[in-house]
């Protein structure tokens, strides 16, 4: 059978998070709750920023874009996972699997670069406050967001194109709850050396470059904060950055655990646990992290709800 015909006819079976029948309903309810909070939190954040003039600043423009990405890549993964918790045959078509892989990579890579853009925004705000409006113009902000999505699209196109050249003839059971790169490579009966090299290069670049950029930004930020004379000013600066830094550590920590090792050295069960963090937990936490400790967001929300 040719690869073209095989690809059109193939179905995969998603192994899911666990095979224990007694855990399927509790896990369904847990992840349904997480997904509802994710959707409400991120769409609510986008709407709040859109209708509140107080939040029409570069920082919240990036936060709105981040909320959009969190909503999208959670929605690429979670609905199918919820269906599989209740289904007997957890099948996914080859074409659906490739589409899921493509959009997952687009949004997860874009998330990393948006977090980097937000770090740069904080760097300019704290280290060059007088030039902030000139540097972080609407054109620059839009360009940074577009660059994040372009790099996500380029990474997804490369991974998906390389994956579609592989044959899957050993087994159709994917030991994961969604179509990710590593489980698919482990399933293929083709030579995957090129795919593994691409994974190492692309994942390494998309993790190392943003991490270094964030680290450099925060090194300058810390230096500037330590030279602020008033304790109130230092406290305000730390408060502005702490939420973002927390999101960065959680996101890049889980990504690094997943992709900074060769596929052969990864335990797929460990990968499932790590994947849960950046596919379901992080999209839920981000709007909470950025809103609970943010006076501007709480003030805007109060104004929308009570009109004061």
From Swiss-Prot:
<feature type="transmembrane region" description="Helical; Name=3">
    <location>
        <begin position="100"/>
        <end position="120"/>
    </location>
</feature>
<protein>
    <recommendedName>
        <fullName>Olfactory receptor 8D1</fullName>
    </recommendedName>
</protein>
<feature type="transmembrane region" description="Helical; Name=6">
    <location>
        <begin position="238"/>
        <end position="258"/>
    </location>
</feature>
<dbReference type="GO" id="GO:0005886">
    <property type="term" value="C:plasma membrane"/>
</dbReference>
<feature type="topological domain" description="Cytoplasmic">
    <location>
        <begin position="47"/>
        <end position="54"/>
    </location>
</feature>
<keyword id="KW-0675">Receptor</keyword>
<dbReference type="InterPro" id="IPR000725">
    <property type="entry name" value="Olfact_rcpt"/>
</dbReference>
<feature type="topological domain" description="Cytoplasmic">
    <location>
        <begin position="218"/>
        <end position="237"/>
    </location>
</feature>
<feature type="topological domain" description="Extracellular">
    <location>
        <begin position="76"/>
        <end position="99"/>
    </location>
</feature>
<dbReference type="GO" id="GO:0007186">
    <property type="term" value="P:G protein-coupled receptor signaling pathway"/>
</dbReference>
<keyword id="KW-0552">Olfaction</keyword>
<feature type="topological domain" description="Extracellular">
    <location>
        <begin position="1"/>
        <end position="25"/>
    </location>
</feature>
<dbReference type="Pfam" id="PF13853">
    <property type="entry name" value="7tm_4"/>
</dbReference>
<keyword id="KW-1133">Transmembrane helix</keyword>
<keyword id="KW-0472">Membrane</keyword>
<feature type="disulfide bond">
    <location>
        <begin position="97"/>
        <end position="189"/>
    </location>
</feature>
<comment type="similarity">
    <text>Belongs to the G-protein coupled receptor 1 family.</text>
</comment>
<feature type="transmembrane region" description="Helical; Name=1">
    <location>
        <begin position="26"/>
        <end position="46"/>
    </location>
</feature>
<dbReference type="GO" id="GO:0004984">
    <property type="term" value="F:olfactory receptor activity"/>
</dbReference>
<keyword id="KW-0807">Transducer</keyword>
<dbReference type="GO" id="GO:0005549">
    <property type="term" value="F:odorant binding"/>
</dbReference>
<dbReference type="InterPro" id="IPR000276">
    <property type="entry name" value="GPCR_Rhodpsn"/>
</dbReference>
<feature type="glycosylation site" description="N-linked (GlcNAc...) asparagine">
    <location>
        <position position="5"/>
    </location>
</feature>
<keyword id="KW-0812">Transmembrane</keyword>
<feature type="topological domain" description="Extracellular">
    <location>
        <begin position="161"/>
        <end position="197"/>
    </location>
</feature>
<feature type="topological domain" description="Extracellular">
    <location>
        <begin position="259"/>
        <end position="271"/>
    </location>
</feature>
<feature type="topological domain" description="Cytoplasmic">
    <location>
        <begin position="293"/>
        <end position="308"/>
    </location>
</feature>
<dbReference type="GO" id="GO:0004930">
    <property type="term" value="F:G protein-coupled receptor activity"/>
</dbReference>
<dbReference type="GO" id="GO:0007608">
    <property type="term" value="P:sensory perception of smell"/>
</dbReference>
<feature type="transmembrane region" description="Helical; Name=5">
    <location>
        <begin position="198"/>
        <end position="217"/>
    </location>
</feature>
<feature type="transmembrane region" description="Helical; Name=7">
    <location>
        <begin position="272"/>
        <end position="292"/>
    </location>
</feature>
<keyword id="KW-0716">Sensory transduction</keyword>
<feature type="transmembrane region" description="Helical; Name=2">
    <location>
        <begin position="55"/>
        <end position="75"/>
    </location>
</feature>
<dbReference type="InterPro" id="IPR017452">
    <property type="entry name" value="GPCR_Rhodpsn_7TM"/>
</dbReference>
<feature type="transmembrane region" description="Helical; Name=4">
    <location>
        <begin position="140"/>
        <end position="160"/>
    </location>
</feature>
<feature type="topological domain" description="Cytoplasmic">
    <location>
        <begin position="121"/>
        <end position="139"/>
    </location>
</feature>
<feature type="glycosylation site" description="N-linked (GlcNAc...) asparagine">
    <location>
        <position position="186"/>
    </location>
</feature>
<keyword id="KW-0325">Glycoprotein</keyword>
<keyword id="KW-0297">G-protein coupled receptor</keyword>
<comment type="function">
    <text>Odorant receptor (Potential). May be involved in taste perception.</text>
</comment>
<keyword id="KW-1015">Disulfide bond</keyword>
<keyword id="KW-1003">Cell membrane</keyword>
């Amino acid at each position: 059978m040719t690869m073209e015909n095989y690809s059109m006819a193939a179905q995969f079976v998603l192994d899911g998070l666990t095979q224990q029948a007694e855990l399927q309903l509790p896990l369904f309810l847990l992840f349904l709750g997480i997904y509802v909070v994710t959707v409400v939190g991120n769409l609510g954040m986008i709407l709040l920023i859109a209708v509140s003039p107080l939040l029409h600043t570069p920082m919240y423009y990036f936060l709105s874009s981040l909320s959009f990405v969190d909503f999208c890549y959670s929605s690429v993964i979670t609905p199918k996972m919820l269906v599989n918790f209740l289904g007997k045959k957890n099948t996914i078509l080859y074409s659906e699997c490739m589409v899921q892989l493509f959009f997952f990579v687009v949004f997860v890579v874009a998330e990393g670069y948006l977090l980097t853009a937000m770090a740069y925004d904080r760097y300019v705000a704290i280290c060059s406050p007088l030039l902030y409006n000139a540097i972080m113009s609407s054109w620059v902000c839009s360009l940074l967001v577009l660059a994040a999505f372009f790099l996500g699209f380029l990474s997804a196109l490369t991974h998906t194109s390389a994956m579609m050249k592989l044959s899957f003839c050993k087994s159709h059971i994917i030991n994961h709850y969604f179509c990710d790169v590593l489980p698919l490579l482990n399933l293929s009966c083709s030579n995957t050396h090129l795919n593994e090299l691409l994974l190492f290069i692309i994942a390494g670049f998309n993790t190392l470059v943003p991490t270094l950029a964030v680290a450099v930004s925060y090194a300058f930020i810390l230096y500037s904060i330590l030279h602020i004379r008033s304790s109130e000013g230092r406290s305000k600066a730390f408060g502005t950055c702490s939420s973002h830094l927390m999101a960065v550590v959680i996101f890049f920590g889980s990504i690094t655990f997943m992709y900074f090792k060769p596929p052969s050295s990864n335990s797929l069960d460990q990968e499932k646990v790590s994947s849960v963090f950046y596919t379901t937990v992080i999209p839920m936490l981000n709007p909470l992290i950025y809103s609970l400790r943010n006076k501007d967001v709480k003030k805007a929300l109060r104004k929308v709800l009570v009109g004061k």
